[in-house]
Amino acid sequence: ETFDGVSWNASVSFKTEIGFIPYITAAEQATLVAGQGAEIGVGQVSDGAFDTSDLFEYGIKGSFLDDSLYFALSIYEQERTDFSAQAIVTNSTTENNGTEFELRWVINDNLVVGAGYTNIKVYNVTAMEEGNQFGFFGIEDLSSVTDASLLYGGAVIGFNLVDDKESARKAGIPENIYTLNATYDFQNGYAVNASLVKADETFSSFSQVVTLPSYTLINAGIFYEADSWTASLNIKNLTDERYFRANFPDLFGSQIVLPELPRHYQAKFSYKF
């Protein structure tokens, strides 16, 4: 027996005389989704169970100043629906919507600058429909427990209740992220670069009881290129910012957060022969 899935996409754009290009894109993709262990379930084959991803995006972009200045603004909504291969932990149905902005400007032969902005919200549609989300609880989830040592050596599991759409937000994803970057080429083999990333605070866990603080990350570097060799030195987290990321937020977000690297250095040398 044979089952069919259909994927399609359509896009319309229009280039105006002044350089603006508005566009609209719609797409649908049918995919056979594997389970947590990369297995294909027998029921999936017999039922012809496909996952469907829907995307709708519109925006405007353009190039100006002899194509030295480029920008793009997009607003999108995406939903992956129909099938969950392993309950709601690894393959849940999600709804994503957001806005993205990008700017690149080649100011002259020496200097290139860029900026970006991302606003995104991701919702666990499966949890909304079922009214709950399974997870491991941390001490912050158990407000009546005053002695945290009572939980040492074990783990409390249960279901987080989902009352509304906002309580079904996927954790670990900052709603707003801002970026700036610049590269200066001295035209003598040397170049320097710097970048800045600023991210909002965000919940670490689906239960929304643990909050990861906002952070500002600055990186900088220097590069040299000769005829036969190149060398570079990059300083990551220049200001030694203390920040964290979530670890499997739908499941372990109340129990574990991961510290990111403090200030560190990366050096690279290459020789061509």
Q: What positions do the PLM features span?
A:
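Extracellular loop and loop/strand-boundary signature of outer-membrane beta-barrel proteins
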Residues: E1, A38-D47, S84-T90, N96-E100, ...
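Structural signature of Gram-negative outer-membrane beta-barrels, strongest in the C-terminal barrel
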Residues: E1-Q78, N96, V106-N108, T118, ...
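Residues that define the transmembrane beta-barrel architecture of outer-membrane proteins
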Residues: T2-V6, T52-F56, E77, T93-T99, ...
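Strand-connecting loop/turn motifs
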Residues: E17-G19, F64-S68, V106-N110, V122, ...
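Transmembrane beta-strands of outer-membrane beta-barrel proteins
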Residues: P22-I24, L69-L73, V113-A115, L180, ...
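Outer-membrane beta-barrel translocator domains and adjoining extracellular loop/strand segments
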Residues: A34-G43, D82-V89, I120, V125-N132, ...
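Gram-negative outer-membrane beta-barrel transporters
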Residues: E77-E79, N91-F206, K268-K272
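C-terminal beta-signal and adjacent terminal beta-strands/loops
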Residues: K198-S205, F223-F273
